[in-house]
Protein backbone atom coordinates (compact mmCIF):
# COMPACT_ATOMS: atom_id res chain seq x y z
CA UNK A 1 0.00 0.00 0.00
CA UNK A 2 2.80 2.40 0.84
CA UNK A 3 4.46 1.81 -2.54
CA UNK A 4 1.19 2.62 -4.32
CA UNK A 5 0.81 5.82 -2.31
CA UNK A 6 4.33 6.94 -3.19
CA UNK A 7 3.74 6.24 -6.88
CA UNK A 8 0.43 8.12 -6.70
CA UNK A 9 1.94 11.22 -5.09
CA UNK A 10 4.93 11.30 -7.44
CA UNK A 11 2.73 10.94 -10.53
CA UNK A 12 0.19 13.45 -9.21
CA UNK A 13 2.94 15.90 -8.28
CA UNK A 14 4.54 15.67 -11.72
CA UNK A 15 1.15 15.93 -13.44
CA UNK A 16 0.30 18.97 -11.33
CA UNK A 17 3.68 20.55 -12.05
CA UNK A 18 3.24 20.16 -15.81
CA UNK A 19 -0.24 21.66 -15.82
CA UNK A 20 0.68 24.41 -13.35
CA UNK A 21 3.68 25.35 -15.50
CA UNK A 22 1.42 25.35 -18.56
CA UNK A 23 -1.17 27.55 -16.83
CA UNK A 24 1.49 29.98 -15.63
CA UNK A 25 2.89 30.22 -19.16
CA UNK A 26 -0.62 30.95 -20.45
CA UNK A 27 -1.17 33.68 -17.85
CA UNK A 28 2.25 35.35 -17.75
CA UNK A 29 3.63 34.84 -21.28
CA UNK A 30 0.49 35.50 -23.28
CA UNK A 31 2.29 36.86 -26.36
CA UNK A 32 4.55 33.85 -26.71
CA UNK A 33 1.74 31.36 -26.05
CA UNK A 34 -0.58 33.11 -28.50
CA UNK A 35 2.11 32.65 -31.16
CA UNK A 36 2.18 28.92 -30.37
CA UNK A 37 -1.61 28.74 -30.55
CA UNK A 38 -1.68 30.53 -33.91
CA UNK A 39 1.06 28.22 -35.23
CA UNK A 40 -0.95 25.17 -34.13
CA UNK A 41 -4.15 26.57 -35.61
CA UNK A 42 -6.02 27.19 -32.35
CA UNK A 43 -7.90 30.40 -31.48
CA UNK A 44 -6.11 32.60 -28.97
CA UNK A 45 -9.24 33.29 -26.94
CA UNK A 46 -8.81 29.78 -25.47
CA UNK A 47 -5.63 30.71 -23.61
CA UNK A 48 -7.06 32.33 -20.47
CA UNK A 49 -9.98 29.88 -19.98
CA UNK A 50 -7.58 26.94 -20.35
CA UNK A 51 -5.20 28.44 -17.79
CA UNK A 52 -7.99 28.94 -15.27
CA UNK A 53 -9.40 25.45 -15.85
CA UNK A 54 -5.97 23.86 -15.43
CA UNK A 55 -5.53 25.56 -12.06
CA UNK A 56 -9.04 24.60 -10.94
CA UNK A 57 -8.41 21.03 -12.11
CA UNK A 58 -5.28 20.79 -9.99
CA UNK A 59 -7.26 22.02 -6.99
CA UNK A 60 -10.02 19.46 -7.68
CA UNK A 61 -7.56 16.57 -7.91
CA UNK A 62 -5.54 17.53 -4.84
CA UNK A 63 -8.41 18.42 -2.51
CA UNK A 64 -10.74 15.53 -3.42
CA UNK A 65 -13.73 17.56 -2.22
CA UNK A 66 -15.96 16.40 -5.08
CA UNK A 67 -15.53 13.05 -6.78
CA UNK A 68 -17.37 14.33 -9.83
CA UNK A 69 -15.11 17.38 -10.20
CA UNK A 70 -12.02 15.25 -9.65
CA UNK A 71 -13.04 12.84 -12.40
CA UNK A 72 -13.91 15.77 -14.66
CA UNK A 73 -10.46 17.26 -13.99
CA UNK A 74 -8.76 13.96 -14.81
CA UNK A 75 -10.75 13.79 -18.07
CA UNK A 76 -9.68 17.32 -18.97
CA UNK A 77 -6.08 16.54 -18.03
CA UNK A 78 -6.21 13.61 -20.44
CA UNK A 79 -7.99 15.35 -23.34
CA UNK A 80 -5.80 18.46 -23.25
CA UNK A 81 -2.44 16.73 -23.81
CA UNK A 82 -3.92 14.23 -26.28
CA UNK A 83 -5.16 17.11 -28.42
CA UNK A 84 -1.85 18.94 -27.94
CA UNK A 85 0.04 15.80 -28.99
CA UNK A 86 -2.03 15.47 -32.16
CA UNK A 87 -1.61 19.17 -32.95
CA UNK A 88 2.17 19.01 -32.49
CA UNK A 89 2.42 15.87 -34.63
CA UNK A 90 0.32 17.43 -37.40
CA UNK A 91 2.44 20.59 -37.44
CA UNK A 92 5.63 18.48 -37.08
CA UNK A 93 7.31 20.97 -34.76
CA UNK A 94 8.93 18.32 -32.55
CA UNK A 95 7.44 19.80 -29.37
CA UNK A 96 5.32 16.79 -28.44
CA UNK A 97 7.31 15.31 -25.53
CA UNK A 98 5.64 17.40 -22.80
CA UNK A 99 2.25 16.19 -24.03
CA UNK A 100 3.40 12.56 -23.92
CA UNK A 101 4.69 13.01 -20.36
CA UNK A 102 1.47 14.74 -19.29
CA UNK A 103 -0.56 11.82 -20.68
CA UNK A 104 1.61 9.27 -18.87
CA UNK A 105 1.54 11.14 -15.55
CA UNK A 106 -2.23 11.69 -15.78
CA UNK A 107 -2.99 8.03 -16.48
CA UNK A 108 -0.62 6.91 -13.71
CA UNK A 109 -2.12 9.38 -11.23
CA UNK A 110 -5.68 8.34 -12.11
CA UNK A 111 -4.88 4.61 -11.90
CA UNK A 112 -3.12 4.86 -8.55
CA UNK A 113 -5.78 7.21 -7.21
CA UNK A 114 -8.18 4.30 -7.64
CA UNK A 115 -5.77 1.88 -5.99
CA UNK A 116 -4.90 4.09 -3.02
CA UNK A 117 -8.23 5.78 -2.33
CA UNK A 118 -10.49 3.01 -3.62
CA UNK A 119 -12.62 2.54 -6.68
CA UNK A 120 -15.74 4.43 -5.90
CA UNK A 121 -19.07 5.03 -7.49
CA UNK A 122 -20.93 8.24 -6.99
CA UNK A 123 -24.58 8.89 -7.45
CA UNK A 124 -24.96 12.00 -9.55
CA UNK A 125 -28.71 12.29 -9.08
CA UNK A 126 -30.35 12.38 -5.68
CA UNK A 127 -31.92 9.08 -4.70
CA UNK A 128 -35.04 8.72 -2.63
Which residues make up each language-model segment?
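Extended, low-polarity transmembrane helix blocks
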Residues: 1-22, 62-128
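Membrane-interface helix termini and inter-helical loops of multi-pass transporters
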Residues: 30-40
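Membrane interface segments of multi-pass transport proteins and intramembrane proteases
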Residues: 2, 39-42
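Core segments of alpha-helical transmembrane spans in multipass integral membrane proteins
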Residues: 17, 21-24, 42-62, 76
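Short, surface-exposed linear patches
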Residues: 41-42, 48-49, 82, 106-107
Amino acid sequence: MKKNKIIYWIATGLMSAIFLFSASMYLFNYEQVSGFFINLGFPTWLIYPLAILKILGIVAVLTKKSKFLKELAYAGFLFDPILALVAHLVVSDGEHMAAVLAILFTITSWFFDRKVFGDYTQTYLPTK
